[in-house]
Each structure stands twice: as structure tokens, then as C-alpha cells.
């Protein structure tokens, strides 16, 4: 913003709350304005646009000054002498005024105006919240700024948002009076989807505020935002239909609902939704994963096994979206029909179906005539793999067993309206698919493989045109169609690294354009009780009628090793360095897995007895059976007492197993410890004095690929983990060729269950599919304790128990919080 001189703004100048919990700083504590500049997410509001004089013949104050006692009460920092030790460098005032004239235009307090922008750029938008003259007779006004969408984290995706829509900020600073350009008309409207019908003629309108901490778009608290001078000022801000802003009474009523429904997209084996439901349960909210969608059939089998109450769909999400739209049409046609169906209608349909079943039992096929008995399922896609995508029903034919069931296109069932109506009515009643407004919460991590650093052909210029990134668009389109109350998107940090954070900005822009509040943060798995450093991005969304959830602060002391883009490093969920907090000691590999029984490279048992006792609190609680855990229903399939699932490793081939047996059982051991390898300045080379060693198969003990990996500078090939370590991440492939995966004391890679422990899966969570598929499910999962912590803050938001702060302290640690009865107090060693 235009200024005569460069100086620091005082705490009084900028009213962004400066809670130590809001920012993690690697340097000494700084004030909120300096933090904003360090984040560099916005064009600087403090830069001088072009030379302006503080006093001008075309700018002057009008009328008598505000009485001294009134002015000193409202702006005390302007009338106190600066202490040399104080950070307060605010300008001092001789008089305050209510009106000023600039270039013949009369301005009043609380008027809105354009303020001179930088050369060649648009003028800034602000509310005049203060007018004063300094002891040196310089004329200033204080601006409270509005952001255009492109001034926020959305940046280049500002086109997603209405050009007339702006966002209020808490940022204020002083500017020379003659920087005012002209008055503008800004209206405040209710933050709802019908806003376009309610917008009166204006230059701009706003319904949310934007704060730099955690890049937050949120509702405006009208009571706290109202100026005491606004009634006198003749302000040109109009508040329109304010009753549309959320009301606490509605929120309290909603929190008494028996359950909240969750749709898990890109669900994998269900780790994210499982954790969210755990956390919500701890907060006092019953969250149920009603629907889940994933393209991997083995992951779907795992989720269904552990969550029999969930409708699990194994299909692409774009087909799922098409199905949702078709399902809504069918429900309109057969159920709603312009009005809600009565219970008697639904019961009549059920009775008709039962009658048809009874009649079918008396019939037997006497010819090859196929008659539809009932419809079993519905999908959109190409189930017959005949390149004819569309809407299909699975048909059970009258007089035939299930082996004759087939998928039939809707066009071929035009004579089966009764069967179709029965299916739709029952499906509607059972909510086999969500209709708009029925999914309270949508979570998911749309794969964005086009941003991966392993992808050499990334499209940096147009990331959304890359087929590998299109799932982000599909995810947002599903949200747009279903209109859930809450949204949580998870993704890799690369979405903020790649192409200037293009995809992350797009995601925020889509949510805001759909009238969702939004907030972005990064969380490290190790900070919530796991021995791994993995960092992930989480984006919250909440309708204007709901409270925007916060992020849970860490419970364990772990320093992340992830490379975070400088522009986004301040959204890391963490305590500030100067904040006194009591964090538990980081969990290491030993504390997580050393109670598990030894297994061999070729072990193939999918379940076995523990044969051991837990040695740490983590091990004690991670072994809990379903009946002992929060949020698990009685119909969940319970593991037999004392049985351990999935504790088997990927079987290495003969050559790799022989190599692993040669790796010393010591900290830091890897292929560099093998005979014939020299290391000079962290780069490997062959030892010319040693003859190359060969395996029984005739292949070399030290493979060439190990010597050339990362140009000979990597120590990862055939690396052995150690008990006191924390792993960088849990991988999807258990091959030891370029990863540190070997067990500290056994000649094998970590087992599926050991990897699952590192991701926080309870031992009772059984996985399905081939061994490699189970490793993939675990590696792709969201760490369960991270999801649990987020579920807890979601529950607080639903209950109306959280404030506007982006961060919340957790009153528990993982995994002791899983216990249905907390008779044993966690001593902090977990």
C-alpha cells in the first residue's frame, strides 16, 4: 500500500490476533505483520506505490477534531509516548477527524475507497477506519484492507471467483491522506449459495474474511466487526440479509443428531475415514462411513471387511459422479416425484418385493425365456467391458440362480418399470447412494501423480490438463454436486511445490467459489505418536452454516525432515519455538514393533499368535480388540483373542535374500558394508584390491544398480533400519533395492503388519489381497492418528466447542485414546 516512508507496523496497526500457537518460527518471535511478509503469499501491502505527499493542497480534514477524550479512548496508542524498549513504532496523533476531502470528494470514517496501487496495477480496496493529523501536521488515514481473490492464496485461479467478490481482512496500516482515489460501494451479504439473487447494485460485495495464518477463508463475526463510529459515519457498507449467517442455535440442534454420514473418496483400505470416525467419537459425535469409493478392488475388500456397515464401491470416481447424477434423476422420478414419499409408500414397495420373492419360489424355468425378477445393484460405466459405457442395473432373472445374474443397460429395461421402481424406492430408503445434502462430510485424497518428483514428464504450464491430475477436478465436482457440510482433502506436499502450488491454489479456489470456508495446513505423522516423518497437506472446507474446524496441535516431539516450499512453510501445524509446551518423546521403531514375534523371509501365514507381551503403552493399545475400542459397532468382524494379522514380509528372491544375509546387523548398515565397496567423500567406488564377490547364482553380491543409484551417493540400497530410528516414510513397495527397509535384527524387509504399525493401524485391522497389494494399501494410507486428531477437531466444530483459532490442543495421545475405557492413564511413554 502507498506510504511515505518504510517502517514497521505496530501491534495496534494490525489487529491480526498474534497467538503464539498460530505460527511456527525458526527465528525469534515476530509480529503478525512481519510474519505475513515472511510467508510471501500476498503482494506486499506495505510497499510504496508511487510518491505521495503527506500533505497536499487537494487533501484536507473537514470539520472539528474528534473530542480528545473520545479519540484517546478509541486510539490510545496514538497518544502515548513510544518507549525505546517497546515494539510500538506507530505514528502519533495530534488530532483525529471524522471527515476529510481529497480531490473534491468527501470521505467519512467507515467509508470504502480505492487507494492508489502500484504503478500499472489495480488500486487497492479499503475501509477508512481512522483519520488523524500527526504532531508534525502530517495527514494520514488508516486503511483496513480487502483482498481480491488473486491477492490471496488462490492467486492465478482468481477467475474461479466472482470479480466483484472480495474478502475482508484484519490487516490495517497508515497511509498518506492523498492516496485516496475515490469512494466505492461495498455491500456485505450472507454467505450462502443463493447470494447472486441477493446482491444489490454495488462495486464489490463480501461475505467472508481472509486471514494469512493457515490461509483461512471464514465467516465474519458481525458483532465483533462492527465499529462504534459506524452509526455516525454514514458508512457506505450495507449488510444484506445477515440472518443468513450461521446461528449457534441451529448448530446446537444439529449436534444432537444420532449420527453424521461420511463419504470416503479414494478411500484405499479406509485408514483416513477410520481415523476420522475414531476422533469424532472421542469428541462425542457419531460419525459413520456410509459410503466409500476406490478403484483398487483389494483396498475395497479390506475396507468392507473392517467396515461391513459401509456401502463400498469399486469404481473410478468419475463414474461414481455420473452415477450420483443418474441416481438423483431416478429418485426424482420414482420416489420424490415433486413431493416427499410417505413411509406407507416405501412399506408398500417392500411388501410388493416380498410378494414377488414368494411367487418366484413357486416358479421354475420351463423355457429359455428370461424375465426380470428384481434388480440387485446399479452402476455407471462399462461393467460388461464391451465399450458401451452408461447406466447399468444388475439383474436377477426369474427362475435362475445368481450365476445367471447380468449387468443390463437401462435402455434394455424399459418394460421393467415396476422392478426399477422397487429398486429405487428401497435404495432411497436405505441410502445406498448419497443424494445432494445427504453426505454430511466428504473426505479423500485425490491422486495427483502428475506433480510427483518421479514423473519426468510433468506439465508445469498447465497441470490440470495432465490426465494424472484430473482427479482433483473430479473430487471438487463431487463436492459441488453433493454439497456436504464439511470437506477434508488430503494430499502430498508436492501439490504445493509443483508449479508454484498451482494445484493447491486451485483446490482452495474451487472451495471458496462453491461458498465453502477453507483452511490449509500441513501435518507430520510423527507429531501424533508414530515413528515416521511423513508430511501431508490437509485442506478443510465448511459451509457457511457450520463452524470451520481447526488443526490439532502436535502431541509428540518430532522434527519433520520434509522439504517444505518457503512460500507455504508457515502453514505447518506446530507450536512456535518460543512457546512452552509439554510434548511427549518421539516414538521410535523399537517402541512401535519390538513386541512382534520373529518371522522369516519365506513365512506365509496371514494370521498367527503373538506369543509375546506388549512392552510399551503404544504396543499395549495398538493390540486392542474391536470390542475394546471406541466407535466400533457390534457387527464389526472381531479378531480372535491373541491373533495377529498380516505379520508376514514380502518374500525376497534368492539373490536378494542372500545379499540381505550379508548386511551387518548394526545401525546404519547397507550395501556399502559389503566386500569390495569403497566410500570416498560419500561416493562409492569399487575396491581395486578386492576381487568381485559373486552369489551362488553367479550374480554379483553388490549389484551395479546399487553402485550407480543417485550417482553413487545414496546409502539406501539394502539399508538396515535400527531400533532408535524414525523412518522417513512408509513406502508402497517393499523392495530393498533403493530403500532402507530391512529389519534391524532379522534378514528380511519389514512385514506388512510392522509397516501398518508405523501408519498407526490397530492390529485388529485386517488387510486383503496379495502381499504386494497389502503393502501398497498401507503405504498409500493416511496415518490413522493424524486422521483421528482431525476427526476430533471436526467433532468440536460440530458441537460448537471450537473458536476461530486455526489450532487446537489435543487432550489425549495416540493410541491410548482408542480404548473404550481409559482406566489406565497414559504415562507419556507412548
Give residue spans per PLM region.
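Eukaryotic short linear interaction motifs
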Residues: 2, 116, 121-124, 133-140, ...
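Conserved proline-anchored active-site loop of SAM-dependent methyltransferases
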Residues: 262-276, 397-399, 435-457, 486-492, ...
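C-terminal target-recognition/interaction regions appended to catalytic cores
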Residues: 260, 404, 598-830
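SAM cofactor-binding core of SAM-dependent methyltransferases
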Residues: 263-324
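PEST-like, low-complexity acidic/proline-rich intrinsically disordered segments
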Residues: 1-17
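Class I S-adenosyl-L-methionine
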Residues: 323-359, 374, 378-390, 431-439, ...
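Epigenetic mark-reader domains in eukaryotic nuclear proteins
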Residues: 31, 36-105, 136-251, 346-349, ...
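Short beta-strand-centered aromatic/proline hotspots
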Residues: 110-111, 121-134, 141-144, 373-377
Amino acid at each position: 500500500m502507498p506510504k511515505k516512508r518504510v517502517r514497521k507496523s505496530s501491534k495496534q496497526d494490525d489487529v491480526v490476533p498474534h497467538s503464539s500457537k498460530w505460527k511456527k518460527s525458526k527465528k525469534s518471535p515476530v509480529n503478525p505483520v512481519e510474519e505475513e511478509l515472511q510467508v510471501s503469499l500476498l503482494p506486499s501491502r506495505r510497499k510504496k506505490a508511487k510518491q505521495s505527499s503527506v500533505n497536499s493542497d487537494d487533501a484536507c480534514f473537514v470539520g472539528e477534531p474528534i473530542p480528545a477524550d473520545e479519540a484517546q479512548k478509541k486510539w490510545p496508542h496514538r497518544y502515548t509516548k513510544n518507549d525505546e524498549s517497546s515494539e510500538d513504532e506507530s505514528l502519533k496523533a495530534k488530532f483525529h477527524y471524522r471527515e476529510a476531502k481529497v480531490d473534491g470528494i468527501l470521505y467519512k470514517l467507515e467509508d470504502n475507497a480505492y487507494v492508489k496501487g502500484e504503478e500499472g496495477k489495480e488500486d487497492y480496496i479499503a475501509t477508512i477506519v481512522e483519520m488523524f493529523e500527526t504532531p508534525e501536521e502530517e495527514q494520514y488515514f488508516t486503511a483496513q484492507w480487502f483482498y481480491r481473490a488473486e491477492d490471496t492464496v488462490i492467486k492465478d485461479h482468481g477467475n474461479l471467483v466472482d470479480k466483484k467478490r472480495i474478502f475482508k481482512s484484519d490487516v490495517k496500516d497508515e497511509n498518506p491522506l492523498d492516496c485516496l482515489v475515490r469512494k466505492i460501494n461495498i455491500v456485505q451479504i450472507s454467505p450462502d449459495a443463493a447470494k447472486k439473487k441477493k446482491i444489490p447494485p454495488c462495486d464489490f460485495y463480501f461475505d467472508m474474511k481472509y486471514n494469512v495464518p493457515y490461509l483461512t477463508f471464514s465467516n465474519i463475526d458481525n458483532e465483533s466487526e462492527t465499529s462504534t463510529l459506524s452509526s455516525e459515519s454514514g458508512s457506505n457498507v450495507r449488510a444484506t440479509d445477515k440472518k443468513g449467517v450461521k446461528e449457534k442455535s441451529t448448530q446446537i440442534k444439529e449436534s444432537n443428531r444420532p449420527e453424521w454420514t461420511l463419504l470416503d473418496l479414494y478411500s484405499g483400505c479406509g485408514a483416513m475415514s477410520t481415523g476420522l470416525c475414531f476422533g469424532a467419537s472421542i469428541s462425542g459425535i457419531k460419525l459413520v462411513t456410509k459410503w466409500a469409493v476406490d478403484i483398487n478392488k483389494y483396498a475395497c475388500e479390506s475396507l468392507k471387511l473392517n467396515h461391513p456397515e459401509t456401502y463400498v464401491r469399486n469404481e473410478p470416481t468419475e463414474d461414481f459422479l455420473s452415477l450420483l447424477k443418474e441416481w438423483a434423476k431416478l429418485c426424482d422420478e420414482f420416489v420424490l416425484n415433486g413431493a416427499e414419499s410417505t413411509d406407507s409408500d416405501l412399506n408398500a414397495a417392500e411388501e410388493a418385493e416380498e410378494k414377488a420373492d414368494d411367487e418366484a419360489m413357486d416358479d421354475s424355468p420351463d423355457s429359455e425365456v428370461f424375465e426380470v425378477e428384481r434388480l440387485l445393484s446399479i452402476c455407471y460405466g462399462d461393467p460388461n467391458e464391451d465399450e458401451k459405457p452408461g447406466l447399468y442395473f444388475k439383474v436377477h432373472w426369474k427362475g435362475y440362480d445368481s450365476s445367471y445374474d447380468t449387468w443390463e443397460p437401462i435402455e434394455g429395461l424399459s418394460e421393467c418399470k415396476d422392478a426399477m421402481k422397487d429398486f429405487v424406492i428401497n435404495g432411497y430408503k436405505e441410502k445406498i447412494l448419497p443424494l445432494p445434502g445427504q453426505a454430511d462430510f466428504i473426505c479423500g485424497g485425490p491422486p495427483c501423480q502428475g506433480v510427483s518428483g518421479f514423473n519426468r514428464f510433468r506439465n508445469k504450464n498447465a497441470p490440470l490438463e495432465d490426465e494424472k491430475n484430473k482427479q482433483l477436478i473430479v473430487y471438487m465436482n463431487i463436492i459441488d454436486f453433493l454439497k456436504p457440510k464439511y470437506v477434508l482433502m488430503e494430499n502430498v506436499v508436492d501439490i504445493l511445490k509443483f508449479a508454484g502450488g498451482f494445484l493447491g491454489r486451485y483446490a482452495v479456489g474451487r472451495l471458496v467459489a462453491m461458498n465453502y470456508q477453507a483452511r490449509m495446513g500441513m501435518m507430520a505423522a510423527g507429531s501424533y505418536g508414530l515413528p515416521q516423518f511423513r508430511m501431508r497437506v490437509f485442506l478443510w472446507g465448511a459451509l457457511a452454516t457450520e463452524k470451520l474446524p481447526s488443526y490439532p496441535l502436535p502431541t509428540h516431539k518430532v522434527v519433520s525432515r520434509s522439504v517444505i516450499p518457503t512460500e507455504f512453510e508457515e502453514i505447518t501445524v506446530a507450536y512456535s519455538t518460543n512457546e512452552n509446551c509439554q510434548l511427549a518423546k518421539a516414538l521410535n521403531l523399537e517402541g512401535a514393533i519390538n513386541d512382534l514375534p520373529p518371522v522369516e523371509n519365506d513365512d506365509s501365514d496371514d494370521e498367527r499368535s503373538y506369543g509375546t507381551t506388549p512392552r510399551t503403552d503404544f504396543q499395549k493399545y495398538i493390540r486392542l480388540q474391536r470390542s475394546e475400542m471406541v466407535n466400533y459397532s457390534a457387527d464389526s468382524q472381531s479378531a480372535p483373542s491373541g491373533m495377529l494379522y498380516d505379520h508376514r514380509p514380502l518374500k525376497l528372491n534368492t539373490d536378494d535374500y542372500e545379499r540381505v544375509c550379508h548386511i551387518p546387523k548394526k545401525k546404519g548398515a547397507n550395501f556399502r558394508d559389503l566386500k569390495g565397496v569403497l566410500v570416498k567423500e560419500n561416493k562409492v567406488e569399487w575396491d581395486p584390491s578386492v576381487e568381485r564377490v559373486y552369489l551362488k547364482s553367479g550374480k554379483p553380491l553388490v549389484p551395479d544398480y546399487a553402485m550407480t543409484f543417485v550417482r553413487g551417493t545414496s546409502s539406501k540400497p539394502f539399508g538396515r533400519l535400527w531400533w532408535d530410528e524414525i523412518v522417513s516414510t512408509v513406502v508402497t513397495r517393499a523392495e530393498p533395492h533403493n530403500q532402507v527397509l530391512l529389519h534391524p535384527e532379522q534378514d528380511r524387509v519389514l512385514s506388512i503388519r510392522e509397516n501398518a504399525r508405523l501408519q498407526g493401524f490397530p492390529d485388529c485391522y485386517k488387510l486383503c489381497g496379495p502381499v504386494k497389494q497389502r503393502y501398497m494399501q498401507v503405504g498409500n494410507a493416511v496415518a490413522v492418528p493424524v486422521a483421528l486428531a482431525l476427526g476430533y477437531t471436526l467433532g468440536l466444530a460440530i458441537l460448537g466447542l471450537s473458536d476461530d483459532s486455526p489450532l487446537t490442543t489435543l487432550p489425549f495421545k495416540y493410541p491410548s485414546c482408542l480404548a473404550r475405557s481409559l482406566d489406565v492413564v497414559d504415562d507419556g511413554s507412548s
